[in-house]
Amino acid sequence: MTLAEIAEYANVSIGTVDRVIHNRKGVSEKTKAQILAIIDKYGYKPNVIASQLKSNKAFVIGVLLPYLETGDDYYRALYEGMSQAVAQLSPIKIELKLVTFDRQISGDAIKKSSVFFDGDENAIDALITTPVVQDEIMEIVSKLDGKPFVYIDTPLGTTQPLLTVVQNPYKGGYCAGRIMRMFQGGGKFACITMYSSGYNLRERVRGFTDYIQKDAGSVVLDEICTDITELGFYKFMKDLFERHNDIKGIFVPHAEVSLATYYLVDQGLNSRVTVVGYDLVEKNRQGLLDGSIDCLIGQRPEQQGSEAVHKLYQACMLHQHVPSRIDMPIDIYFKENII
Protein backbone atom coordinates (compact mmCIF):
# COMPACT_ATOMS: atom_id res chain seq x y z
CA MET A 1 0.00 0.00 0.00
CA THR A 2 1.10 3.56 -0.62
CA LEU A 3 1.28 6.17 2.11
CA ALA A 4 -2.00 7.71 0.92
CA GLU A 5 -3.77 4.33 0.86
CA ILE A 6 -2.64 3.56 4.42
CA ALA A 7 -3.88 6.96 5.57
CA GLU A 8 -7.28 6.39 3.96
CA TYR A 9 -7.57 2.87 5.39
CA ALA A 10 -6.69 4.08 8.91
CA ASN A 11 -8.82 7.23 8.58
CA VAL A 12 -5.91 9.48 9.50
CA SER A 13 -3.88 12.12 7.66
CA ILE A 14 -0.96 11.33 5.36
CA GLY A 15 1.23 13.32 7.73
CA THR A 16 0.31 11.03 10.61
CA VAL A 17 1.28 7.95 8.60
CA ASP A 18 4.53 9.62 7.57
CA ARG A 19 5.38 10.34 11.22
CA VAL A 20 4.79 6.70 12.15
CA ILE A 21 6.86 5.37 9.24
CA HIS A 22 9.78 7.62 10.16
CA ASN A 23 9.29 7.06 13.92
CA ARG A 24 8.68 10.71 14.73
CA LYS A 25 6.77 12.02 17.75
CA GLY A 26 3.24 13.41 17.77
CA VAL A 27 1.15 10.25 17.29
CA SER A 28 -0.80 8.45 19.99
CA GLU A 29 0.21 4.89 20.82
CA LYS A 30 -3.23 3.62 19.74
CA THR A 31 -3.03 5.28 16.32
CA LYS A 32 0.58 4.21 15.88
CA ALA A 33 -0.32 0.58 16.64
CA GLN A 34 -3.23 0.75 14.18
CA ILE A 35 -1.02 2.08 11.37
CA LEU A 36 1.77 -0.42 12.04
CA ALA A 37 -0.77 -3.26 11.98
CA ILE A 38 -1.98 -2.13 8.54
CA ILE A 39 1.60 -1.91 7.25
CA ASP A 40 2.40 -5.33 8.70
CA LYS A 41 -0.65 -6.86 6.98
CA TYR A 42 -0.55 -5.12 3.60
CA GLY A 43 2.99 -3.79 3.32
CA TYR A 44 4.17 -0.29 2.49
CA LYS A 45 5.32 0.79 -0.95
CA PRO A 46 6.83 4.29 -1.09
CA ASN A 47 5.77 6.55 -3.93
CA VAL A 48 9.23 6.69 -5.45
CA ILE A 49 8.22 8.83 -8.43
CA ALA A 50 6.68 11.49 -6.21
CA SER A 51 9.73 11.49 -3.94
CA GLN A 52 12.06 11.88 -6.91
CA LEU A 53 10.00 14.67 -8.41
CA LYS A 54 10.20 16.46 -5.09
CA SER A 55 13.97 16.02 -4.76
CA ASN A 56 14.71 16.26 -8.52
CA LYS A 57 17.56 13.77 -8.02
CA ALA A 58 18.33 10.56 -9.87
CA PHE A 59 19.53 7.40 -8.17
CA VAL A 60 23.07 7.02 -9.53
CA ILE A 61 24.56 3.54 -9.91
CA GLY A 62 28.28 3.32 -10.58
CA VAL A 63 29.18 0.48 -12.94
CA LEU A 64 32.78 -0.77 -12.90
CA LEU A 65 33.59 -3.38 -15.56
CA PRO A 66 36.52 -4.53 -17.69
CA TYR A 67 36.58 -2.92 -21.13
CA LEU A 68 33.24 -3.81 -22.70
CA GLU A 69 34.79 -5.19 -25.87
CA THR A 70 36.92 -7.70 -23.93
CA GLY A 71 35.57 -11.18 -23.41
CA ASP A 72 34.37 -10.95 -27.03
CA ASP A 73 31.71 -8.46 -25.86
CA TYR A 74 30.65 -10.51 -22.82
CA TYR A 75 30.99 -7.46 -20.58
CA ARG A 76 29.01 -5.40 -23.07
CA ALA A 77 26.16 -7.90 -22.64
CA LEU A 78 26.28 -7.40 -18.86
CA TYR A 79 26.01 -3.64 -19.31
CA GLU A 80 23.24 -3.93 -21.90
CA GLY A 81 21.21 -5.88 -19.36
CA MET A 82 21.61 -3.02 -16.88
CA SER A 83 20.58 -0.45 -19.49
CA GLN A 84 17.49 -2.48 -20.34
CA ALA A 85 16.50 -2.57 -16.67
CA VAL A 86 16.85 1.21 -16.38
CA ALA A 87 14.55 1.61 -19.40
CA GLN A 88 12.03 -0.82 -17.90
CA LEU A 89 11.94 1.13 -14.62
CA SER A 90 11.23 4.46 -16.32
CA PRO A 91 9.94 6.99 -15.23
CA ILE A 92 11.95 6.19 -12.09
CA LYS A 93 15.11 8.24 -12.50
CA ILE A 94 18.02 5.81 -12.39
CA GLU A 95 21.34 6.79 -13.94
CA LEU A 96 24.21 4.45 -14.81
CA LYS A 97 27.71 5.90 -14.50
CA LEU A 98 29.96 3.51 -16.44
CA VAL A 99 33.71 3.22 -15.83
CA THR A 100 35.79 0.54 -17.59
CA PHE A 101 39.30 -0.73 -16.90
CA ASP A 102 42.00 -3.02 -18.29
CA ARG A 103 41.99 -6.17 -16.16
CA GLN A 104 45.50 -7.05 -17.35
CA ILE A 105 47.06 -3.84 -16.01
CA SER A 106 47.68 -3.98 -12.27
CA GLY A 107 46.00 -1.13 -10.41
CA ASP A 108 43.93 0.05 -13.37
CA ALA A 109 40.59 -0.71 -11.70
CA ILE A 110 41.57 1.36 -8.65
CA LYS A 111 42.83 4.20 -10.81
CA LYS A 112 39.76 4.34 -13.05
CA SER A 113 37.26 3.98 -10.18
CA SER A 114 38.64 7.06 -8.41
CA VAL A 115 36.11 9.13 -10.38
CA PHE A 116 33.37 7.68 -8.16
CA PHE A 117 34.95 9.30 -5.11
CA ASP A 118 35.92 12.62 -6.69
CA GLY A 119 33.55 15.05 -4.98
CA ASP A 120 29.76 15.35 -4.81
CA GLU A 121 29.33 15.98 -8.53
CA ASN A 122 30.49 12.45 -9.38
CA ALA A 123 29.11 10.74 -6.27
CA ILE A 124 27.27 7.46 -6.70
CA ASP A 125 24.49 5.93 -4.60
CA ALA A 126 25.44 2.30 -5.29
CA LEU A 127 27.95 0.23 -7.25
CA ILE A 128 27.71 -2.77 -9.58
CA THR A 129 30.96 -4.52 -10.42
CA THR A 130 32.58 -7.86 -11.18
CA PRO A 131 35.53 -8.74 -8.89
CA VAL A 132 37.77 -10.21 -11.58
CA VAL A 133 40.71 -8.44 -9.90
CA GLN A 134 39.85 -9.36 -6.34
CA ASP A 135 42.35 -7.34 -4.29
CA GLU A 136 41.57 -4.16 -6.21
CA ILE A 137 37.81 -4.58 -5.94
CA MET A 138 38.13 -5.20 -2.19
CA GLU A 139 39.97 -1.89 -1.85
CA ILE A 140 37.38 -0.07 -3.97
CA VAL A 141 34.30 -1.32 -2.09
CA SER A 142 35.97 -0.45 1.22
CA LYS A 143 35.75 3.20 0.14
CA LEU A 144 31.99 3.12 -0.39
CA ASP A 145 31.30 4.12 3.21
CA GLY A 146 28.30 1.87 3.66
CA LYS A 147 26.76 2.40 0.23
CA PRO A 148 25.34 -0.80 -1.27
CA PHE A 149 27.21 -2.74 -3.92
CA VAL A 150 26.35 -5.73 -6.09
CA TYR A 151 28.63 -8.34 -7.64
CA ILE A 152 27.81 -9.87 -10.99
CA ASP A 153 29.58 -12.65 -12.91
CA THR A 154 32.07 -13.43 -10.11
CA PRO A 155 31.57 -13.83 -6.33
CA LEU A 156 33.90 -12.50 -3.66
CA GLY A 157 33.19 -14.06 -0.29
CA THR A 158 35.48 -11.87 1.84
CA THR A 159 33.23 -8.80 1.44
CA GLN A 160 29.55 -8.16 2.17
CA PRO A 161 27.69 -7.10 -0.98
CA LEU A 162 23.98 -6.40 -0.94
CA LEU A 163 23.63 -9.07 -3.61
CA THR A 164 25.71 -11.44 -5.74
CA VAL A 165 24.32 -12.50 -9.14
CA VAL A 166 26.40 -15.38 -10.48
CA GLN A 167 26.46 -18.86 -11.89
CA ASN A 168 28.14 -21.47 -9.70
CA PRO A 169 31.57 -21.69 -11.39
CA TYR A 170 32.58 -25.08 -10.00
CA LYS A 171 29.33 -26.69 -11.13
CA GLY A 172 29.72 -25.06 -14.55
CA GLY A 173 33.20 -26.52 -14.96
CA TYR A 174 32.03 -29.90 -13.66
CA CYS A 175 29.23 -29.85 -16.23
CA ALA A 176 31.78 -29.01 -18.96
CA GLY A 177 33.81 -32.05 -17.90
CA ARG A 178 30.75 -34.27 -18.14
CA ILE A 179 30.04 -32.98 -21.65
CA MET A 180 33.66 -33.51 -22.72
CA ARG A 181 33.54 -37.11 -21.50
CA MET A 182 30.33 -37.63 -23.48
CA PHE A 183 32.19 -36.57 -26.63
CA GLN A 184 35.56 -38.20 -26.05
CA GLY A 185 35.47 -40.65 -23.16
CA GLY A 186 38.86 -40.66 -21.44
CA GLY A 187 42.24 -39.36 -22.55
CA LYS A 188 44.28 -36.17 -22.41
CA PHE A 189 42.55 -32.79 -22.24
CA ALA A 190 43.67 -29.18 -21.83
CA CYS A 191 42.11 -26.29 -19.92
CA ILE A 192 43.24 -23.05 -21.55
CA THR A 193 42.79 -19.68 -19.83
CA MET A 194 44.00 -16.25 -20.83
CA TYR A 195 44.15 -14.76 -17.35
CA SER A 196 46.42 -15.89 -14.54
CA SER A 197 43.93 -14.91 -11.84
CA GLY A 198 40.18 -14.91 -11.35
CA TYR A 199 38.16 -16.95 -8.88
CA ASN A 200 35.57 -17.94 -11.47
CA LEU A 201 38.13 -19.26 -13.92
CA ARG A 202 40.03 -21.30 -11.36
CA GLU A 203 36.81 -22.82 -10.01
CA ARG A 204 35.64 -23.78 -13.51
CA VAL A 205 39.00 -25.41 -14.20
CA ARG A 206 38.80 -27.23 -10.86
CA GLY A 207 35.29 -28.50 -11.61
CA PHE A 208 36.29 -29.65 -15.10
CA THR A 209 39.40 -31.40 -13.80
CA ASP A 210 37.52 -33.13 -10.99
CA TYR A 211 35.03 -34.65 -13.40
CA ILE A 212 37.58 -35.70 -16.03
CA GLN A 213 39.87 -37.28 -13.44
CA LYS A 214 37.11 -39.51 -12.15
CA ASP A 215 38.57 -41.69 -14.92
CA ALA A 216 41.95 -42.71 -13.49
CA GLY A 217 43.52 -42.89 -16.95
CA SER A 218 42.63 -39.33 -17.97
CA VAL A 219 44.92 -36.29 -17.75
CA VAL A 220 44.07 -32.57 -17.65
CA LEU A 221 46.70 -29.99 -18.62
CA ASP A 222 46.24 -26.57 -16.98
CA GLU A 223 47.58 -24.03 -19.49
CA ILE A 224 47.67 -20.21 -19.46
CA CYS A 225 48.20 -18.05 -22.56
CA THR A 226 48.81 -14.40 -21.69
CA ASP A 227 49.14 -13.20 -25.31
CA ILE A 228 45.50 -12.80 -26.30
CA THR A 229 46.14 -11.60 -29.85
CA GLU A 230 45.12 -14.00 -32.62
CA LEU A 231 48.77 -14.51 -33.63
CA GLY A 232 49.93 -14.98 -30.05
CA PHE A 233 47.24 -17.52 -29.33
CA TYR A 234 47.93 -19.37 -32.58
CA LYS A 235 51.60 -19.72 -31.60
CA PHE A 236 50.58 -20.88 -28.13
CA MET A 237 48.29 -23.57 -29.58
CA LYS A 238 50.98 -24.67 -32.03
CA ASP A 239 53.48 -25.12 -29.20
CA LEU A 240 50.89 -26.92 -27.05
CA PHE A 241 50.06 -29.48 -29.74
CA GLU A 242 53.72 -30.00 -30.60
CA ARG A 243 54.28 -30.94 -26.97
CA HIS A 244 51.05 -32.93 -26.63
CA ASN A 245 49.83 -34.16 -30.00
CA ASP A 246 47.41 -36.59 -28.33
CA ILE A 247 45.12 -33.95 -26.81
CA LYS A 248 41.50 -35.00 -27.38
CA GLY A 249 39.67 -31.95 -26.09
CA ILE A 250 40.05 -28.27 -25.18
CA PHE A 251 38.10 -26.47 -22.43
CA VAL A 252 38.14 -22.64 -22.43
CA PRO A 253 36.46 -21.37 -19.22
CA HIS A 254 35.69 -17.86 -20.49
CA ALA A 255 34.26 -16.14 -23.55
CA GLU A 256 37.31 -16.03 -25.85
CA VAL A 257 36.70 -19.59 -27.07
CA SER A 258 36.98 -18.70 -30.75
CA LEU A 259 40.69 -17.88 -30.37
CA ALA A 260 41.37 -21.52 -29.52
CA THR A 261 39.71 -22.72 -32.72
CA TYR A 262 41.83 -20.91 -35.32
CA TYR A 263 44.80 -23.25 -35.00
CA LEU A 264 42.62 -26.36 -34.84
CA VAL A 265 40.73 -25.43 -38.02
CA ASP A 266 43.93 -24.38 -39.82
CA GLN A 267 45.62 -27.69 -39.01
CA GLY A 268 42.54 -29.81 -39.69
CA LEU A 269 42.36 -30.92 -36.06
CA ASN A 270 38.85 -29.69 -35.28
CA SER A 271 37.29 -32.96 -36.48
CA ARG A 272 39.09 -34.97 -33.77
CA VAL A 273 39.60 -32.37 -31.00
CA THR A 274 36.47 -31.40 -29.06
CA VAL A 275 36.11 -27.76 -28.00
CA VAL A 276 33.91 -26.86 -25.01
CA GLY A 277 33.78 -23.28 -23.77
CA TYR A 278 31.82 -20.50 -22.14
CA ASP A 279 29.34 -17.83 -23.24
CA LEU A 280 27.09 -17.47 -26.25
CA VAL A 281 28.69 -14.27 -27.56
CA GLU A 282 28.41 -13.74 -31.31
CA LYS A 283 31.82 -15.17 -32.26
CA ASN A 284 31.13 -18.30 -30.25
CA ARG A 285 27.66 -18.60 -31.69
CA GLN A 286 29.17 -18.61 -35.17
CA GLY A 287 31.68 -21.21 -34.00
CA LEU A 288 28.85 -23.50 -32.94
CA LEU A 289 27.14 -23.06 -36.29
CA ASP A 290 30.27 -23.76 -38.36
CA GLY A 291 31.32 -26.70 -36.20
CA SER A 292 34.59 -25.28 -34.84
CA ILE A 293 33.06 -25.22 -31.33
CA ASP A 294 31.18 -28.28 -30.07
CA CYS A 295 29.44 -26.97 -26.96
CA LEU A 296 29.05 -23.76 -24.95
CA ILE A 297 27.91 -23.07 -21.41
CA GLY A 298 25.89 -19.88 -21.07
CA GLN A 299 25.40 -17.79 -17.93
CA ARG A 300 22.85 -15.18 -19.09
CA PRO A 301 24.91 -11.97 -18.80
CA GLU A 302 22.01 -9.70 -19.80
CA GLN A 303 19.85 -11.17 -17.05
CA GLN A 304 22.67 -10.77 -14.52
CA GLY A 305 22.93 -7.07 -15.31
CA SER A 306 19.17 -6.61 -15.23
CA GLU A 307 18.78 -8.40 -11.89
CA ALA A 308 21.48 -6.22 -10.34
CA VAL A 309 19.67 -2.98 -11.25
CA HIS A 310 16.20 -4.25 -10.32
CA LYS A 311 17.36 -5.51 -6.93
CA LEU A 312 19.15 -2.24 -6.13
CA TYR A 313 15.92 -0.41 -6.99
CA GLN A 314 13.89 -2.70 -4.73
CA ALA A 315 16.33 -2.49 -1.83
CA CYS A 316 17.34 1.16 -1.96
CA MET A 317 14.23 2.89 -3.31
CA LEU A 318 11.38 0.64 -2.22
CA HIS A 319 13.15 -0.52 0.97
CA GLN A 320 12.22 -4.12 0.24
CA HIS A 321 14.15 -7.21 1.29
CA VAL A 322 16.21 -8.76 -1.50
CA PRO A 323 18.06 -12.10 -1.47
CA SER A 324 21.80 -12.06 -0.87
CA ARG A 325 22.44 -14.28 -3.89
CA ILE A 326 20.80 -15.11 -7.21
CA ASP A 327 22.16 -18.17 -8.99
CA MET A 328 22.09 -18.19 -12.77
CA PRO A 329 21.19 -21.48 -14.52
CA ILE A 330 23.83 -23.48 -16.38
CA ASP A 331 22.61 -23.17 -19.97
CA ILE A 332 24.03 -25.70 -22.44
CA TYR A 333 24.21 -24.90 -26.14
CA PHE A 334 24.89 -27.17 -29.07
CA LYS A 335 24.61 -26.32 -32.75
CA GLU A 336 21.15 -27.86 -32.85
CA ASN A 337 19.53 -25.79 -30.09
CA ILE A 338 20.53 -22.21 -30.88
CA ILE A 339 18.27 -19.88 -32.82
Place the predicted regions along the sequence by residue.
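Hydrophobic alpha-helical
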Residues: 124-145, 208, 226-283
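Amphipathic helical "hinge" segments at domain boundaries
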Residues: 46-108
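Hinge/beta->alpha junction and helix N-cap segments in small-molecule ligand-binding domains
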Residues: 67-74, 97-109, 165-172, 191-213, ...
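Hinge/cleft segment of the Venus flytrap/periplasmic-binding protein
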Residues: 38, 211-212, 300-339
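N-terminal helix-turn-helix DNA-binding module of bacterial transcription factors
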Residues: 1-55
